Curated annotation (Swiss-Prot):
Belongs to the archaeal-type GTP cyclohydrolase family. This is GTP cyclohydrolase III. Catalyzes the formation of 2-amino-5-formylamino-6-ribofuranosylamino-4(3H)-pyrimidinone ribonucleotide monophosphate and inorganic phosphate from GTP. Also has an independent pyrophosphate phosphohydrolase activity. It is an enzyme of class 3 (hydrolase).
């Protein structure tokens, strides 16, 4: 089974509104601070985090003990202007785990499976068409992947540039996902007991495809 941690910043909207209309520069600085705390605290315990609304944060946490998760969340609390709550979900897929958050399901935790995906030749496309063109292509890829994840049971996030990260239920799930993506892509897929190690392996696979100037998928176990 896969394990997901869902973190919520309680009262975040009310806090932002309390700052008055000249507030966005403050909000952005605080969001950056929380984002940094999220990544440093959760990767330190082997989990793979991301934000998908700045008042909600998520982490793939297969095989990460509960007390380590408590420690990671405590570090986020120290960076947050509001109370921080979290729940843990377990499921046969990462998406199932997210949807069951707080239901106290139990089971043997599987290896984490993570994909690191990018669009081929985006550097040249950016040089010719400009960065907004590449950014919109990346968002199209993410939107397509997110739709496919409803069927596959995965969760996809934008990483920046032309990259996305995907929490996968199993390695072969990447093929069902990429079948729907129109742009030529490379995907490294990492498999490991701990999610951040799986992501590191996925990046190694992606780097190998780039070095060989190949498209497709490379799985690293």
């Amino acid at each position: 089974m896969h394990k997901v941690v869902l973190i919520s910043l309680r009262g975040y909207r009310e806090w932002t509104e309390s700052l008055g209309p000249r507030r966005e520069h403050i909000i952005q600085k605080v969001q950056a601070r929380i984002h940094g705390a999220l990544w440093s605290s959760f990767t330190a315990v082997g989990a793979l985090p991301h934000h998908f609304r700045y008042d909600y944060l998520i982490a793939l946490a297969n095989n990460v003990p509960r007390h380590w998760i408590d420690t990671a969340v405590a570090k986020i609390r120290r960076s947050s202007p509001v109370e921080v709550d979290y729940c843990i979900g377990m499921g046969e897929t990462p998406l199932d785990a997210y949807r069951s958050c707080g239901e106290h399901k139990e089971g043997k935790e599987s290896n984490a499976v993570v994909a690191h995906v990018d669009i081929v030749n985006s550097t040249d496309a950016t040089r010719i068409n400009g960065p907004i063109h590449t950014y919109l292509r990346a968002l199209d890829m993410l939107r397509t992947a997110a739709g496919a994840c409803e069927d596959v049971g995965c969760i996809a996030f934008y990483l920046g540039g032309d990259n996305m990260v995907v929490y996968l239920p199993e390695p072969k799930a990447i093929y069902a996902l990429l079948d729907r993506v129109e742009a030529p892509v490379r995907a490294g897929v990492g498999v490991s007991p701990r999610p951040y190690t799986a992501f590191v392996k996925a990046t190694k696979g992606l780097d190998a495809l780039r070095a060989e100037n190949k498209t497709g998928v490379k799985v690293v176990r």
